[in-house]
């Protein structure tokens, strides 16, 4: 994966394959459920998890969505084991995430 910013040449780390995880929950998630999930993760010390580079939460077509960039699939999976009980407890059915290998990230 190459990482580019406007003031330097691309930095390429062939050892690292970042991933994009896109969630479209199967249940109708409210902002209150989302905020409660983050609050519980912070309280337990599980937020921000190692390997999470970006977390973006938004609504699209009236449905709550989350997209994340992770350093590795292994870190994503490890956090998922801690996250799933919290989601279940607050009533969120996350569905199966779409997982995509990242080719490039460009930052300003």
Where are these regions (language model features)?
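Short S/T/G/P-rich N-terminal loop/turn motif that feeds into the first structured element of a domain
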Residues: 1-67, 71-85, 93-108
């Amino acid at each position: 994966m190459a990482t580019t910013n406007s003031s330097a040449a691309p930095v390429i780390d062939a050892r690292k394959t970042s991933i994009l995880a896109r969630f479209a929950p199967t249940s109708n998630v409210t902002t209150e459920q989302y905020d409660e999930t983050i609050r519980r993760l912070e309280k337990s010390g599980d937020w921000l998890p190692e390997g999470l580079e970006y977390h973006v939460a938004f609504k699209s077509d009236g449905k709550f969505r989350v997209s994340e960039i992770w350093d590795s699939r292994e870190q994503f999976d490890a956090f998922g084991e801690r996250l799933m009980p919290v989601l279940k407890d607050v009533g969120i059915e996350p569905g199966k995430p779409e997982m995509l290998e990242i080719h490039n990230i460009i930052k300003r």
